[in-house]
Amino acid sequence: MNYRSNKSLLLLAGLMAMGLSACKDNDPDVSGQGNVEDADFVGKTVGNFSADEWYPGGKLGTTDNVTAGCYEDETPVVVDNEKLELAFKLGEAVFERNFTDNTAPFKGLGPAYLRSSCIDCHPGYGHGKRQTSYPSTYGNGYLLAIYHPKSEGSNDGAYISEVTGMPQTLASAPFLPPVDGSQIRIEWKHVTAMESGLPMKFPDGETYDLIYPEVTIPESAFNTNPKPTNYAVRLESTIGVIGTGLIDAIPQDSIIAQYKKEAAVGVELNPSFWDKGANDMAASAWYKFTVPGTDSKGQPVEKMLKRFTYALTRASLQDGPGANAVWNITNVTRSDRPYLYTTNAWAKAMSENESVLKAIMADPTSPYYGDGSRDSVQHMVYNLLRPGTNQFDNPWHKFQAEMSDDQFYNFMVWHRGLSIPRARDLNDTDVQRGKELFMSMGCAHCHRPQWTTGDDNYWSPNNISLKPLPKYPHQKIYPYSDFVQHKLCMKNDIHGSWCRTTPLWGRGLSLANTGAEDRLHDCRARNEVEAIMWHGYSKNSQAYFAAAKFYKLSKKDRDCVVKFLRAI
C-alpha cells in the first residue's frame, strides 16, 4: 500500500495528539487516528469486521497512511505506474496552485470567478470549513444557492437567472463581481426546540446544541442588470474529493438496483430520479454528456446515471463536479469548455458600467477595446462576457484555451487517483460495538456500507480519451452511502430539500487533515452527535427513527457509535 512519509506532517499530528490528550476521559477520541494500537490486526478479521473492511477503497484504492496529509495520497494503482505517478503530481499542482489572469502555466482566471484555486474550497483535500462570513479565501468551501422560494421559508424553487448557479463573488479588473461578497451576511442561529419533539437533552442528562445558518444578501450586492428580486439563499459546502474515482467505478446497474430495493420497501424517492408508476429510473436521472466522449474501450456513450454532487447533477467523474469545477469556479477555459460561466445579466451590467468602460477605453491592449469608442467597447464587453459566446471562435476576439488538454488530463489522473485512508482501530471493542449499533439502528439503510466496483470502463471526453486513467476493477469498497437522495427536513435545509447520502469513509481523519470536522451539507454539525441529531429534527425526516434510537442510547453507546464513525 502507498504510504507517504512527511516528517513535518507527522510532527503536526503528534502535536495535535498531545493537545487532544487533555480531553476528558469520557470523551471519545476526536483525532480519528484512534487510541488502540491496530498494526498487528490490519488486514485480519476482528470481531464483527471482515478483513476487507480495513481497506475501504479495496486493495487498489486504499492508502496505509492514516496521519495528517493522508487525504493527499495517491492510490496503489498510481504508485505502481510511473507515467500515472508523474501525471498525478502534475495534476496535483493544478488543484493546489492559484490561477492568475495571465501568468503561465496557471493562467486564465476570470473575468468572473469564485476562487483562484481548487484547494481554497477543499482545505486539506477535505470538506469545507464552517464560516461566519463569506471570505473568498482558503477554507471557505461554501457555494451560494440563490433561488426564488416557492413560499415563505421554502427550500425549493428555481435558481435566479441573474447570476450563475454557483454565484461568483470575485472578478478580474476592471470588472465587478456578479455578487459583492463583502455584503453577504451569515448568522448562525441556535435551535431552541426540535420540531420532532425530541428533547435537547439525552435521557442521561447530557445536552446537545444544534445551529443553522441564516444567509442574507441585499439587492445592492448584485452587479447585474436586471437585479434579482424575491430570492432566498442557502449554503452548500464542498464535499471531500478523496475516493471519487472508486465511486466512478461502481456499475450503474448496481446503483439502479439500490433504487429498486429502496422503492420496494416503500422509501419515498425523488420523482426526478425515480418514476414510481413505471417502477424504473426517471428520464431526468440520466445525464447526457455536454461534450463528445467514449468509454475506456473506445465505445461511444450517450448517457449515464447521475451519482455525483448533493443534487445528483453529474454522472461520470471525467465530466463531473471536479472536471466542471476546475472550469466554472475559476472560469479557466479549455478545449471542451470554450464558453465562460457567466450570465447575460452580468454581461449587460458590465457593458453599462462607467468605471469598466473608462478603464478599457484607456487600454488599447485590452481584448475588449475594439476601435476604442464607447459604443465599440460596450459592444465588445457585452458579447465577449456572454455565456453563449465561444471564446475561441467569434467575430470580436478569438481567445486561446487557457488550460491545455495535457493539464486537464493530469488533473483527471490526480482526481481519479486519490485514495481512501485505511480504517483504524477495528480491533477496538468499542468500535465493534459502534458498528453493531449503527447497523441495528438502521443507519445502513441509507449509509450502505459496501459496494463492488465493475470492470471500470470509465467514460472520458474526446480531448483526453486516448490517455489512460487509473482504474479500479472488481474492488470491494466501503463508502457508506447508497448514492440516493433523501430528505432530512432540517431547519433552513439544503436547496431543493433532497440531498444525496454523503459517503462516510475517511471522515474520521478530517480534523487531522483539514483542522476542522464540520459535517452536513452546510457545515452546521460541529461533530458527529450534532449530525446525527439533525437527522431527528423533524418526524418527516427519512432518518428520524434511526436518530430517535440513537437518542435513547446510553452515553457509553453513543460514544461507541462516534468511535465507529471515526474509525471507518
Question: Model-found features: residue ranges?
Answer:
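Bacterial N-terminal signal peptides that target proteins for export
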Residues: 2-10
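Short secondary-structure subsegments characteristic of cysteine-rich extracellular domains
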Residues: 13, 17, 435-438
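C-terminal motif of bacterial Sec signal peptides marking the signal peptidase cleavage site
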Residues: 19-22
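Short, conserved catalytic or interaction motifs in soluble domains
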Residues: 25
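Electron-transfer interface patches adjacent to heme c in soluble/periplasmic c-type cytochromes
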Residues: 28-89, 99-412, 416-429, 435-568
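N-terminal cofactor/phosphate-binding cores enriched in small/glycine residues
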Residues: 92
